[in-house]
Amino acid sequence: MTQSASTAPSWSIDPADVARFSAIAAEWWDPRGKFAPLHVFNPCRLSFIREQALARFERDGNGRTPFEGLRLLDIGCGGGLLSEPMARLGFTVTAVDASEKNIKTAATHAAEQGLEIGYRPATAEQLLAEGAGPFDVVLTMEVVEHVADPGEFLRTCAKLLAPGGLMIVATLNRTLKALALAKIGAEYVLRWVPPGTHDWKQFLKPDELRAFLAGEPVDVHGPFGVAYNPLTGRWSRSADCDINYMMTVTKD
C-alpha cells in the first residue's frame, strides 16, 4: 500500500516552510505576484538545465523535443514553473512537492496547457521508500535552503538518480553578501519576496553541499554562479558565486 504524503518518510521537510508556500500557492503563475522573481529567474535556469542535459546525454539541441525517452524528477516543483518547460522539451516528468496546494495549482495549470505531467504531493524520501525511479535527471532548484536536513535531503535525491544521470542543484550561498542582498535587501527593502521566505542560516556554501554528497557514488561539479543585473532586469551566468549558484551532480 502506498503511503500518503502525510505519513511518508519526510524527515528533511520543514513544516513551517511548507505552510509558508502553501499560503501563496494560488500566485505561482502570476508573473507580477509573489513569485515574480522566479518568473524573471526562470530563463536563466532553463538555459542552464538544457545546456547541461544536452551535453550529458549527447542530444541534438536543434529539435523541439531533444529529451524524448528520458525521465525527469522535479523535487519541490512548486507550481510547476520548471516542470512545464521540461515536459515541452520531451522529458517524461514526475514532479513532487510537500505542499498539496502547490500540486493542485501546478496540475490545474498543466491541464489547461494540455501537458501531461505526473504531479503528486510527496517528498523525496517517500519516492525512495516506494522504490520510485531511478530518474535520468533530478532537479532540486531553490529547494535545499528550505529543508530541515539538507544533507539527508541531498543524499536522498542522489539515490533517486539513475546511473549515467544528471542532478542539478540551485541554491544560495551563506555569505555576508547574500545576507545583505538576498535576505535583507530582497525581503525587507525591495520586497521582491515576502519577508521570512529565507533563513540565511540555511543557505549552503558550495563546499558544504559537496561534503553532504561525499559518501554517495556521484561526482559534484561547480559551483556555477548566476547574477541579477538591475539595469537589464535579467539573470545571467556569472563567475560570482557569492549569492546564487548552481551545481551539477553526475552518477556513472
UniProtKB/Swiss-Prot annotation:
GO terms for biological process: methylation. It is an enzyme of class 2 (transferase). CDD domains: AdoMet_MTases. Its EC number is 2.1.1.222, 2.1.1.64. It catalyses: a 3-demethylubiquinol + S-adenosyl-L-methionine = a ubiquinol + S-adenosyl-L-homocysteine + H(+); a 3-(all-trans-polyprenyl)benzene-1,2-diol + S-adenosyl-L-methionine = a 2-methoxy-6-(all-trans-polyprenyl)phenol + S-adenosyl-L-homocysteine + H(+). It comes from the Bacteria. Belongs to the methyltransferase superfamily. UbiG/COQ3 family. O-methyltransferase that catalyzes the 2 O-methylation steps in the ubiquinone biosynthetic pathway. This is Ubiquinone biosynthesis O-methyltransferase. It comes from Caulobacter sp. (strain K31).
